[in-house]
Swiss-Prot record:
Record's protein name: Large ribosomal subunit protein uL4
Family: Belongs to the universal ribosomal protein uL4 family.
Species of provenance: Thermococcus sibiricus (strain DSM 12597 / MM 739)
InterPro entries in the record: Ribosomal_uL4, Ribosomal_uL4_dom_sf, Ribosomal_uL4_euk/arc_CS, Ribosomal_uL4_euk/arch, Ribosomall_uL4-arc
Assembly with partners or alone: Part of the 50S ribosomal subunit.
Gene3D superfamilies referenced in this protein's UniProt entry, alphabetically: 3.40.1370.10
Amino acid sequence: MKVKVFSLNGEPIEEITLPKVFQTPFRPDLIKRAVIASWTHRIQPQGRDPLAGKRRVTENIGKGRGMARVERIKTSPRFAAFVPFARGGRRAHPPKVEKVIWEGINKKEKKLALMSAIAATANYDLVRARGHVIDNIPQVPLVVENELEKVYRTAQTREIFKKLGIWEDIERAKRNTKVRAGKGKMRGRRYKKAKGPLIVVAKNEGIIQGARNHPGVDVVVVDNLGVELLAPGAHPGRLTIWTKGAIERLREFYG
């Protein structure tokens, strides 16, 4: 499959052949498993103090007193202690740090999921179905010359994005930024933000600084590429801008 390489002005300058990884079959099941595995590895284990509610000297008063035979405070037999239903007692089934909360995925399946997610970025129908605005984009996938990696000013990247036809998708991401419902607003998750274009580069020479402030835009070096960036929310087909150097780096990885 051949694609055109575009300059920063949005004009085609050459034609290259995409690596074989872009021909990988579409596997949404593996992509979802890989994304969930990535999510669960960010969860922090939580548990309770094993001695919580047990730091009391108690005794069993026995039968024959017309009272429930529960553990009671030794110096005040009127008050129950230690048992789950008593004030200040232990929890019946507290969360434990030993609980296995990570979802696993096999190495070969994880690799195939990444390859399938990369190939999904070249599928026009999947990119459109994901909600991206791609009416003015010359081609999918969009490959740009390596000079993009050296742009470090936000104003410059804005003009480049307008010439490449992806600015409308960034505006869509900005419009879809909403205040979260519920108590998540108090817990560092105030806004729900839409995902816009992903920029994949061979090396960072300033582009991360230049593009990171645009709503919904992510920039990543191809060596650090992951399934969650290519398929946010386990929905493959993210609008992706590749530099020519990143494409050549993929060719080294996958042939």
